[in-house]
Amino acid sequence: MKFLALALTILLAAATQAVPMQADAPSQLEHVKVAMMEYMAQVKETGQRSIDLLDDTEFKEYKVQLSQSLDNLQQYAQTTSQSLAPYSEAFGAQLTDAAAAVRAEVMKDVEDVRTQLEPKRAELKEVLDKHIDEYRKKLEPLIKEIVEQRRTELEAFRVKMEPVVEEMRAKVSTNVEETKAKLMPIVETVRAKLTERLEELRTLAAPYAEEYKEQMFKAVGEVREKVGPLTNDFKGQVGPAAEQAKEKLMDFYETISQAMKA
């Protein structure tokens, strides 16, 4: 039992210094000690609960011994931890220094590797370019073959479609003529209907046109009768100007008469 407590205490002290790479080992060691003591308290509590489950009649004496052993274990772990604290701290400092030295060596190795690899970047690029060129040379014939196949297929499709297109073009002309033939009767029917309606309108308007023409002839005759004497009266007074005015009036009259007769 004492050996177990001592081993746990030493393991606790060593593990405390193995994790960090900084110089804050004593403070972290204290945290681990506290955690270890809490863990021992939990172990004792769990063991005590298990002991309490035993029958008091049959295992009473055994339960007392186990409880005492748990108390002794916790007390011994605490005492041992306190007595080994100086050694643990010294060991932790040594471990921290060793870890720092290892870290420095690792960083130095990494830097050395980087320095050695730097000149090889050009070589690596050359190798990669070579591989890519090899892939391109292998793939290029396949790609050309696929492109040529597609071109051949498209040409074959065009050859097949050309007669169909020509046939459709010829059918379009035929269809236009058929459509025209179907539309002509409809157009003629509409034209006949319009002509019929125009004749009906002319028949209805004819009496009104004749009446209007008679009224116009009557009005022109009245104007002529009134203008005739005036021209005779003014003929001697105005001379050639009056004669010209008369001629213009007569021409106007004749124009109106011709328009009404049309």
Swiss-Prot record:
Covalent S-S links between cysteines: none
Domain of life: Eukaryota
Keyword flag Transmembrane: no
Signal peptide: 1-18
Coiled coil: none
Keyword Lipid metabolism set for record: yes
Main location: secreted
Name of the protein this chain belongs to: Apolipoprotein A-I
Sequence repeats: 64-85, 87-107, 108-118, 119-140, 141-162, 163-184, 185-206, 207-228, 229-239, 240-262
Residue numbers spanned by region 3 X approximate tandem repeats: 32-63
Cellular component aspect of the GO annotation: chylomicron; extracellular vesicle; high-density lipoprotein particle; low-density lipoprotein particle; very-low-density lipoprotein particle
General function of this protein: Participates in the reverse transport of cholesterol from tissues to the liver for excretion by promoting cholesterol efflux from tissues and by acting as a cofactor for the lecithin cholesterol acyltransferase (LCAT).
Subcellular location per the Swiss-Prot or TrEMBL entry: Secreted
Family: Belongs to the apolipoprotein A1/A4/E family.
UniProt-listed GO biological process terms: acylglycerol homeostasis; cholesterol efflux; cholesterol metabolic process; lipoprotein metabolic process; phospholipid efflux
Entry's Gene Ontology molecular function annotations: cholesterol transfer activity; phosphatidylcholine-sterol O-acyltransferase activator activity; phospholipid binding
Ranges where the record places region 10 X approximate tandem repeats: 64-262
Keywords: Cholesterol metabolism, HDL, Lipid metabolism, Lipid transport, Repeat, Secreted, Signal, Steroid metabolism, Sterol metabolism, Transport
